[in-house]
Amino acid sequence: MGTQKKGPRSEKVSPYDTTTPEVEALDHQMDTLNWRIWIIQVMMFTLGAVMLLATLIAASSEYTGIPCFYAAVVDYELFNATLDGGVWSGNRGGYSAPVLFLEPHSVVAFTYYTALTAMAMAVYTLITAAIIHRETKNQRVRQSSGVAWLVVDPTTLFWGLLSLWLLNAVVLLLAYKQIGVAATLYLGHFATSVIFTTYFCGRGKLDETNIKAVANLRQQSVFLYRLAGPTRAVFVNLMAALMAICILFVSLMLELVVANHLHTGLWSSVSVAMSTFSTLSVVYLIVSELILAHYIHVLIGPSLGTLVACATLGTAAHSYMDRLYDPISVQSPRLIPTTRGTLACLAVFSVVMLLLRLMRAYVYHRQKRSRFYGAVRRVPERVRGYIRKVKPAHRNSRRTNYPSQGYGYVYENDSTYETDREDELLYERSNSGWE
């Protein structure tokens, strides 16, 4: 009997497998559509950042047709409520004094920091878009929109653009001395900035999901991993520091609104600003440590931003209370020590939170044996190697530039430029016990 030939073995397809050519084509079309929408959002965000920077430059110059300097919100030299120069509040002692606000150069510094940070983030997203386009052409990335959303998702771009346009309107209103309207509009800018910073830090997902997605990106492209990982962490810290400054501004803007509409006394308006700033800052630092730090472990932006805000507000408060000492002493003699004590306690709290975050980040990276921990451990060795290279070169340059020429020129501290190997060995032994 002849042997029966077996036909080709048919492949069994799982009923749960929906990967068909039609589905792949549909996924590709949706990915292309999402990618193009994301590119449009990036362009609009870049336009918003450019317009904000252009508005600040125009509002800072007297030759652009804008009537007033936007940063001069209050004028402590004027004591007449009928003059324009800021928002004014009376008191029981018969005086008339402006409310507490930042000095003009501080306002300029913070607003330009906001604009430059937005410009840097716009350049960052444009570079990311170019690299994703290149990697997609090289067949290293399949879903370009998914990788783009790991860097900046569309929700973040939307709220970021809205916050930039609101700040642009605030600057123009301040330049036209519409202080009350500008202060009210800044409350909306603060709300959008909170949403923008929150989404930019966490992408609206759980921390473990973000960590796994970024880790898997290393297999596709090292450049994209660096953009979505370490580089993005730097921008998160910049935005976190900016959020602390926004808390300072919204506290003072709320003070302007209260003083302008409720006509409160001098000490009442200052108390509103100080209580709002201290409360929001403490809540922000705690939320950053308990929630946001799970996404970016080396998150030092909130503490540093709060520390800078305390120093800036302390400088403005000192100048304010020095000029208006008489009405303050009449209304509330305890206002000056209370303000100083509040700012000092908040500054100490921000330093404590900064040290706590650095310690927890170090412990986390040491347990994970991450690349960041390895890079940190190599820093002292690199510094010592750099010092060994610089010291002999510096010593030779001194002897070359100052020859003795027979005069017996002697350097008293010439031994400080020589490398003492015994000290280095003792230093290494002393550090070995800590490893």
UniProtKB/Swiss-Prot annotation:
Pfam families: Herpes_glycop. Residues 1-36, 133-155, 200-233, 289-294, 356-435 are intravirion. It comes from the Viruses. It is found in: Virion membrane; Host Golgi apparatus, Host trans-Golgi network; Host endosome membrane; Host nucleus inner membrane. Keywords: Disulfide bond, Glycoprotein, Host endosome, Host Golgi apparatus, Host membrane, Host nucleus, Membrane, Transmembrane, Transmembrane helix, Viral envelope protein, Virion. InterPro entries: Herpes_glycop_M. GO terms for cellular component: host cell endosome membrane; host cell Golgi apparatus; host cell nuclear inner membrane; membrane; viral envelope; virion membrane. The chain crosses the membrane at residues 37-57, 112-132, 156-176, 179-199, 234-254, 266-288, 295-317, 335-355. It is a multi-pass membrane protein. N-glycosylated. Its main location: virion. Coiled coil: none annotated. Residues 58-111, 177-178, 255-265, 318-334 are virion surface. Belongs to the herpesviridae glycoprotein M family. Interacts (via N-terminus) with gN (via N-terminus). The gM-gN heterodimer forms the gCII complex. Envelope glycoprotein important for virion assembly and egress. Plays a role in the correct incorporation of gH-gL into virion membrane. Directs the glycoprotein N (gN) to the host trans-Golgi network. This is Envelope glycoprotein M. It comes from Varicella-zoster virus (strain Oka vaccine) (HHV-3). The gene is gM.
